[in-house]
Amino acid sequence: MAIKGPRKHLKRLAAPANWQLPRKERTFTVRPSPGPHSMDKSLPLLLIVRDTLKCADNAREAKKIIQMGKILIDGVKRKEYKHPVGLMDVLSIPELNENYLVLFDENGRISLKKTEKTGVKLCKIVNKTVIKGGHIQLNLHDGRNQIVKVANALKAEEDIYKTGDSVLVSLPEQAVVGHVEFNEGKLAYITGGKHVGEFAKVVEVEKRTLYSDIVTLENKDGEKFKTIKPYVFIVGQDEPVISM
């Protein structure tokens, strides 16, 4: 029989391995709704509230907390318990005065780091296009599209944003307030591969045409390693521009 419409259920056995769910406790788990992050790079908000933060004992309590608007993602109340929460998202609980930054641990699993409220978020530019009117649209890693108004998109002095660069976005206004270029010597956060979750300096970038560029990096111990450019998230010069 043909599939008629989107899948609405997810068995624990079929859930991404990096969710680290007890596979045999129950049959089903929460399937994240389509949103800013892919399923294998995010966690549904309900699982974060119940399993990661331990703010609820069961799914019913977690749903009630979420539906009451007590959880903010990037400064916006999210009342959908299936909302996917992923890399660099800022999760806030105003009643507890707590803020968390979503990162990956050394095994590629979603982890939350307690942080201070900064009012900004770091986003990676994954693509950019020229839209009607000659302005530049930046496509960010979390599904956002930011429009940068320029007089002439063909002029290098105006087209300063490149794919792979990072931008600071204000929360909840969602305006670009900062820019970190992808250059040699910049500090990067690794989001995939066997070095996931590490910080390292960009040493060299090997350009390739048919495949992803190869980036050589050096970690704090002086060890050099290589990974592909999509796994490299620029976060600053010598220190991250946000608390990480």
Curated annotation (Swiss-Prot):
Pfam families from the UniProt entry: KOW, Ribosomal_S4e, RS4NT, S4
Signal peptide: none
Family matches, as CDD domains: KOW_RPS4 (cd06087), S4 (cd00165)
A molecular function (GO) term: structural constituent of ribosome
UniProt keyword Metal-binding present: no
Keyword list, A-Z: Ribonucleoprotein, Ribosomal protein, RNA-binding, rRNA-binding
GO cellular component: cytosolic small ribosomal subunit
Domain S4 RNA-binding: 43-106
Listed GO biological process terms: translation
HAMAP family assigned: Ribosomal_eS4
Similarity remark: Belongs to the eukaryotic ribosomal protein eS4 family.
PANTHER family, sorted: 30S/40S RIBOSOMAL PROTEIN S4, SMALL RIBOSOMAL SUBUNIT PROTEIN ES4
Protein's recorded name: Small ribosomal subunit protein eS4
